Amino acid sequence: MKLTKILLAVLLLALLVLPAILPAAMVNAAIQMLIAALFACAFNLLCGQGGMLSFGHAAYFGVGSFATLHAMSALNGQGLLPTPLLPLIGAMGGFICGLCAGWFATKRAGVYFSMITLALAELLHSLAPHLNTLFGGEAGISSMRAPAWGLDFGDATQVYYLTLGWVVLSIALLYAFTLTPMGRLTFALRENGHRLQFLGYNVHRLRVLVFALSAMFAGIAGGLQALNLESANYVLFDMRFSAEVVLNTYIGGVNVFLGPVLGAALMTFFGNAASDLTQSWLLYQGLLFVLVMMFMPSGLAGLVLCWSAQIRRRGWLAIIPAAFSALLGAGVLSLAVVFLIETLQRVFSQDYQALLMTDQAWPAISLFGREWLPGALLTWATPLLLGGAGLLVLKLARHQWLRLLDDEPVVNAAALRPRVEGEQP
C-alpha cells in the first residue's frame, strides 16, 4: 500500500510537470488521454463494478459535451458557473439522461441490457442531426472559453491543468465511492443480484442509480472535451466512441480500479501516434484487443499486478529471464504482423493497383527504410520467419513462467492450524 501511494504521487508529479517538457501538439494529445481515462473509469463503474455492459455509453459523453457548450454560450464564463466549473453542467446533463435511460435499460439484464443501451444510443445518434436547436444539426455547435479567475484559457497548457484537476478529482470520487456501503452493494450487484433482492434491496433502483452515476462522470468527461475543442457535433453519439471505451476498459483491466485509466491512456496515445504512420491503425487496435482477451483476460493492469507479486516474492533477478523472453518474443511477433499487414495494405491499395496496370512488373514498395519486391520470395519469407522466431521465444517465456510457478513453496495447512494446548508439534 505504501509503495502504491508513492507510485501515485510520482505519477501525479509527472503529470504536473508534463506541459513544461512537451510541445504544444503533444499537450493536446495529453489532454485527450486524460479525458479518455476519465471516460473509461466512469464506464468501469457500470461495467466492471456493477456488472452491466453498456454498448451506448458515448451518448452520455456527448450529452455532457453539448450541455457544457450551451452553458458556455449562455453564461459566457460568468456568474455562478465560471469556465472552470462548467463541467458541472455536463455532469448534470449526463446524470439526468442516465436516470431516464437507465430506468428503461435496467429493466433487463445481461445481453438484453446491452442491446437496449445500444438501441438508445443509436436512436439519439439518428435524431441528433435533425434537432438543430439542441445539437446544431450536422454542423454541430461551437462556443469559446471565456476568461475566469485571472486566466484566459487561451493556450493548451491552461486547458491541460484544468482537465487534470477535474480528472484527478473525479477519479478520486469514483474510488471513494467504492469504499462506501453503496459501492459495496455495487460489487454485490455484479456478483449476484438475486441474492441482494432476497436480502430486501430494490435491485432495479440500485442499478438505475449506478447507471446514472456512471453517466454523470461520463458527462464530466464530455464537458472537458467541450472545453478543450470548443465545439461538438452529432458524431459524438456514434457507435465507434461507445466501442472505443469498451475496448480501452477491457484492455486496461476491468477488475483493477486504475486498469481502465491505463488502457485508455495507452490506446489514445497509440491512436494519435499510429494514425499518422499507417492507415491500418484501427486494425492493430482490434488485434490488440483480441490478443488481450485471449491471453490476458485480466488486462494489462492485471498482468502488471501479477508480475509485481512475483517480484515481491522472488526478487528482480528471478523474474528478468521470463520477462525479457516475453517482451522479446512479443516484439518480434509484432514486427512480423506489422510487416505482413503493411505489405498487404500497400499491395492492395488503389495507387499501387493503378501503377501495376501501367507496368507489367511488380513495382517495389518501401517499408522499414528499404525497398521490397512483392514478387520476391524474401518479401514473404521475412514475416514468416520473424513470426516463427517470435512464437518460439514466447513458448520459451511460457516455460520459464511455468517453472517459476512450479517452484512456489508448498504451505503445510496443518502448520497454519492453531495448536491446541498440550498438542505435540
Feature map (PLM): residue ranges:
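Transmembrane alpha-helices and adjacent helix-loop boundaries
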Residues: 1-425
